[in-house]
């Protein structure tokens, strides 16, 4: 509502699974903390997890048995592109000039003062520069002679071909480092934690895809 844009937010609920006693303790602690802060989180037993999301295998003789889980029913997903578009339009309405496909190549300085930035579309004169480039923030800061205490790691996700509706919530598991939900078009949206290595790469790798699929199965 604040940005006056449909970000396609779907309040389908988010469920975190517990696979061992430490998971159970941690998730119950999180549930209590949420409720103390007015958030309507609940802890589910194994049977309640199965009832809420029937596709989950709750057999107790598998490698990572489900011992329970937390559920926040008002949580959900938003279309990431729509969120970016909404913020962009809101910024535009506030007078921000957004230049697309314009890469910063360098920051022109005079001593400790910034005079402007060199881009693929020419020089932009300015005395102030804001760095909001996520994982590449340290690269831009280095152009100004600053070293940020950051480590950038790839975070990969993938989608399947569209399939019939099988899951109407978001399921996450810290033990296997994976999450899965289903888009409106039927694709399974699957992701995991960050890669083990430090990198600025924006390319995917087959071993991560294989490991992520193994995790959700």
Place the predicted regions along the sequence by residue:
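Active-site lid/adjacent beta-loop-alpha segment flanking the redox-cofactor pocket in flavoenzymes
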Residues: 162-217
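A general structural signal for well-ordered alpha-helical segments in protein cores
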Residues: 1, 24-27, 46, 83-84, ...
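A short, glycine/Asx- and small/polar-enriched loop/turn
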Residues: 22-25, 51-66, 108-115
């Amino acid at each position: 509502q604040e940005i006056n844009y449909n970000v396609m937010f779907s309040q389908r609920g988010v469920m975190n699974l517990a696979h061992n006693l430490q998971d159970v303790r941690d998730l119950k602690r999180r549930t209590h903390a949420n409720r103390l802060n007015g958030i309507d989180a609940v802890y589910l037993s194994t049977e309640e997890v199965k009832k809420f999301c029937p596709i989950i295998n709750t057999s107790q003789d598998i490698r990572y048995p489900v011992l329970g889980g937390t559920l926040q029913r008002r949580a959900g997903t938003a279309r990431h592109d729509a969120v970016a578009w909404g913020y962009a339009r809101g910024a535009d309405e506030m007078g921000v000039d957004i230049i697309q496909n314009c890469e910063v190549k360098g920051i022109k300085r005079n001593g400790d003062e910034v005079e402007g930035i060199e881009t693929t579309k020419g020089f932009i004169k300015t005395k102030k520069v804001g760095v909001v480039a996520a994982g590449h923030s340290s690269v831009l800061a280095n152009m100004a002679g600053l070293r940020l205490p950051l480590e950038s790691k790839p975070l990969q996700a993938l989608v399947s071909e569209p399939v019939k509706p099988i899951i109407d919530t978001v399921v996450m598991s810290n033990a296997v480092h994976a999450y899965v939900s289903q888009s409106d078009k039927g694709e399974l949206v699957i992701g995991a934690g960050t890669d083990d290595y430090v990198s600025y790469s924006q390319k995917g790798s087959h071993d991560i895809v294989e490991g992520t699929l193994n995790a959700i199965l």
